[in-house]
Structures are given as structure tokens and as C-alpha cells.
A protein has these predicted regions:
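Structured beta-strand/loop patches that form or line metal/cofactor-binding pockets in enzymes
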Residues: 1-48, 52, 342-350, 398, ...
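Conserved, mostly hydrophobic/aromatic
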Residues: 6, 44, 108, 121, ...
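Hydrophobic faces of well-ordered beta-strands that scaffold small-molecule active sites
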Residues: 47, 136-140, 181-185, 211-215, ...
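Shared catalytic-loop signature of beta/alpha-barrel
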Residues: 59, 230, 243-260, 265-374
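Extended hydrophobic packing segments that form well-structured cores
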Residues: 371-415
Length: 415
């Protein structure tokens, strides 16, 4: 029998280039931060994980890592227990300990699954219950964006996207390159009527494409209610139009268009009030902050029981995260919508062989045991050096936006 007790846990912060994408919080910084987690067993098997790379996450992982030595990689309850002890011991330094707990567990748990899969010759999708779909469909994630970051001399390859016409160009490029079928617009940047004009331009250009829009809570309930006649029948779901469960319940009560969320139902404690108030009918899961792959499968089961739709949230990520997302989605029977991914926006990669390739907008589950991906150590070293050089330790889209628009002010809701 393989010795699957944990011998070492290594956490390496990295930074990779990110375009100047716009959202309600501001503008993406030139570098996105991630952490690469390696869980090594006593037999020398190394499992991989990828998660957030901001200072609070890195500090917590640094405390948790040595406490995991001797724990078997199958002992997920032990992981939760030891992570909770860290949260309790360090609680005076955490403003939202429960949210950090699920992020700490989510970071390490994936690497434990990968290590166990590699040790036993089984794919993670099989360990999660078995593959239920041959391919996993993803959506084109459309953003308004500046031509280049503040201080850069020339535009990036995407160029400026601030009009409906340029949104159509952006969507066409993603469809041509990756074959995506569904289109998602990140909104909450401009006046709602302007963003809905962008949706109409997309509908005209791509009449068969399912559309969705995500204002990130930027609209008031009153604004959202006024906009519903334009959105009903146009979008497959409306994601986080306004703030909170109660505010969105007001909206859902008067529309057949399902509301979706990745902002206001992000913990198991949010599910009962959401279900009771019928606020969101689609949940966007994310193993990075729900507590890992098992917790995300548990969430999927709850959604199935209560008749909630299920999709998958994304943030700026690289290939280890994308592989984990693909395994999870392939093992989730009730995945009812195409998943989100930021992958087309990233040019760097940390796995051998380069970026995973979309075919007709979908990914196949990587072959091989565990997650089926291998860490590219030269890329890891280069991206770690980026982290050391870039000077960014937290995500601050608002500060980045003010470099472009000094008078810009954050608001949620804003319109």
C-alpha cells in the first residue's frame, strides 16, 4: 500500500500578466496573484493545487502547512479540523474567518485529491464519483477593457473595448479561437442602458448564443426592476444585479428570468435564507472558496434537491485551477449551465505542455492520474520571480482604476 501521509506542503506565490479588464470594483492590475500548492506524501508523490495569492491567504497557508504533516491525504475531515484550529488561534487577525477557512481548505484539498489520485493511479473525476459527461462546456467571458495598462507604451493584443461594436469584435475573436457557445458580459462598469445596448449588439451578431450579464451588484433594486422588461427573454440568467439576498429576492419575485449569484450565496449558511426567500435560482459554485472539490459536490447535491440551477464561477487563474474545475464539472450530474473561465485572457501558464485547449468551447478531462497535469518548474520559478518583482501583494482594482480615471469612485450599488 502506498504511504499517503503528508510529508511536506509547499506554497509558492506567483504573479502572471493580466489585461486591464474592467468591472464594478475598478480595473484589473497588471499582475494577478495566485499560489501554487504542492502536497508531497511520504512516498514522494506530489499533488498540486492552485488558489489565491494575496497576503491573507499566503499568511494563513504558511501557518496551516506544517500542521498537516502526518495527515493522510484522504483525511479531509482532518484538514478541516486543523485549518479551523488555525482560524481560531489567529482569529484576532481575521475580519471574516469563516470565508478564509473555506479558502484555506479549498487551496490544499485539491492538492490532496491530486496526490491520492497519483498514488492510486486514479483520475480525480473518478474519485469524485465518476465522469458523467465527455466534455465540459465553458462560456466566453467578455469584459470592457482599456487598451493598455497605465504606463504601458502600446496597446495589448485585445485593444480597447468600450463600445457595443468592440464587444462584438471581442466575442467574435473568442468564438473563432475557442468555439464558445454562451457569452457572458461583465457589467457594472457603465450606465446600465449602455451595457444592455452591448447585450443587444451581441444578440444581433450571435442570434443563437445564450447570453448572461453580471453587474456585480452595481444596480439598485429599483434600477433592476426598471430594466427587467429589456432583459426578460434576452438573457439566460441575470447574475448578481443588485446587493444581498433580500434585494435580489425583490427582483426574482417579479421575473421569470432566473437570478444567479457568486457573491451572496458563498457559504452553506447563506443557502437557507436564499431558498426561503427565493432570491437566486442559479448558484455559481467555485471550489476555491466553497472549501474544495468535495464541498462543491455537496453544494451541487443541495442545488439538485432544491431545484436550483448550477454553474461555475471563475477568477483569473492558470491551468491547475482549470484542470480541477474540469474534473469537478465532469463529475457533477446537475451542471445546468456552461462554466465561466478567465483562461482566454491569460498568456502565462504553470503546467507542462502549455494552456489547455478548448474545442467547440469545451474541455475534455485531462488524462492521467490525479488532475492529469504536471507542474512546469521553470515557469513556476519565472512566475514566482514576477511575484517578487511586481510589488503587488493584495488585489486593489479601485486603486488601479484611479490611475486611468482619477475622479472615478467605487459604488455598490452605483446605478
Amino acid at each position: 500500500m502506498p504511504d499517503t501521509r503528508i510529508a511536506h506542503v509547499r506554497v509558492t506565490p506567483i504573479a502572471f500578466y493580466d489585461p486591464p479588464l474592467l468591472n464594478n470594483s475598478g480595473c484589473h492590475q497588471p499582475f494577478a496573484l495566485r499560489s501554487i500548492i504542492e502536497v508531497e506524501t511520504e512516498d514522494g508523490v506530489v499533488g498540486l493545487g492552485e488558489s489565491y495569492g494575496t497576503t491573507p491567504i499566503l499568511d494563513g497557508l504558511a501557518i496551516i502547512a506544517p500542521r498537516l504533516c502526518g495527515l493522510d491525504v484522504t483525511n479531509l475531515n482532518g484538514l478541516w479540523s486543523r485549518a479551523r484550529c488555525v482560524i481560531n488561534d489567529e482569529s484576532s487577525g481575521y475580519t471574516n474567518p469563516e470565508n478564509l477557512l473555506t479558502r484555506f481548505v479549498g487551496a490544499i484539498e485539491v492538492a490532496m485529491w491530486d496526490a491520492f489520485g497519483k498514488a492510486t493511479g486514479r483520475r480525480v473525476v473518478d474519485l469524485l464519483g465518476g465522469q458523467v459527461r465527455e466534455t465540459v462546456p465553458f462560456s466566453a467571458y467578455l469584459f470592457y477593457k482599456f487598451a493598455q495598462h497605465h504606463g504601458e507604451a502600446t496597446p495589448d493584443d485585445w485593444g480597447e473595448v468600450l463600445t457595443p461594436e468592440r464587444l462584438v469584435d471581442e466575442a467574435q475573436y473568442m468564438i473563432d479561437q475557442h468555439g464558445f457557445k454562451a457569452l457572458k458580459l461583465k457589467a457594472g462598469v457603465f450606465e446600465p442602458e449602455e451595457e444592455i445596448a452591448g447585450l443587444h449588439a451581441l444578440r444581433t451578431a450571435f442570434p443563437e448564443a445564450p447570453l448572461r450579464i453580471d453587474p456585480n451588484g452595481a444596480w439598485t433594486p429599483e434600477t433592476t426592476l426598471q430594466l427587467l422588461p429589456q432583459l426578460d427573454g434576452l438573457v439566460e440568467y441575470l447574475e448578481d444585479p443588485t446587493c444581498g439576498i433580500q434585494g435580489n429576492a425583490r427582483v426574482q419575485a417579479v421575473t421569470k428570468t432566473p437570478l444567479a449569484t457568486n457573491m451572496y450565496v458563498v457559504h452553506t449558511s447563506h443557502l437557507p435564507p436564499n431558498i426561503a426567500q427565493d432570491a437566486f435560482r442559479v448558484i455559481l459554485s467555485d471550489h476555491h472558496y466553497w472549501g474544495g472539490l468535495k464541498a462543491s459536490r455537496d453544494l451541487a447535491r443541495i442545488c439538485e434537491i432544491w431545484g436550483l440551477g448550477l454553474s461555475m464561477h471563475s477568477n483569473s487563474h492558470l491551468g491547475i485551477s482549470l484542470a480541477a474545475m474540469t474534473h469537478l464539472a465532469a463529475a457533477t450530474p446537475n451542471l445546468t449551465y456552461d462554466c465561466d473561465t478567465h483562461s482566454p485572457w491569460q498568456t502565462d501558464e504553470v503546467i507542462e505542455g502549455g494552456k489547455m485547449i478548448f474545442t467547440d468551447g469545451a474541455l475534455t478531462v485531462p488524462e492521467g492520474p490525479g488532475l492529469g497535469v504536471t507542474l512546469d518548474r521553470e515557469s513556476l520559478a519565472r512566475l514566482h520571480q514576477n511575484y517578487l518583482n511586481c510589488g503587488i501583494t493584495i488585489r486593489d482594482d479601485a486603486a488601479e482604476m484611479k490611475k486611468h480615471r482619477p475622479n472615478w469612485e467605487f459604488g455598490r450599488p452605483k446605478f
